[in-house]
From Swiss-Prot:
It comes from the Eukaryota. It is found in: Plastid, Chloroplast. The gene is ycf20. It comes from Cyanidium caldarium (Red alga). The lineage of its organism: Eukaryota, Rhodophyta, Bangiophyceae, Cyanidiales, Cyanidiaceae. This is Uncharacterized protein ycf20. Its main location: plastid.
Amino acid sequence: MTNTQTRVIKQINKTILATCSFIFLFGFFLSSATSTILIQTNEWSILTAAILISIVELFNYLKHKFQFNDRKSGYNCFFFINLAKLGLLYGLFIDAFKLGS
């Protein structure tokens, strides 16, 4: 590999890392916004949890139904949605610890 190719690959890797970090933190933000806005009244808490779990399980079903072994065009979409899902679940997990303490 030439020096130019190495620099291009390093720049692409930095861009991918920044994009993945942004999407994960966006999922974390969604969990904070969801728990702050929709769960202010006690009537919405069970419905909100059921909807979020349904969305996560639907995504898991679709991901395992269309398993992407190679890097097709749909792979990146599922990868980024999975990162947002992980951020969402991590944020809800952290909120549960905050409520428990």
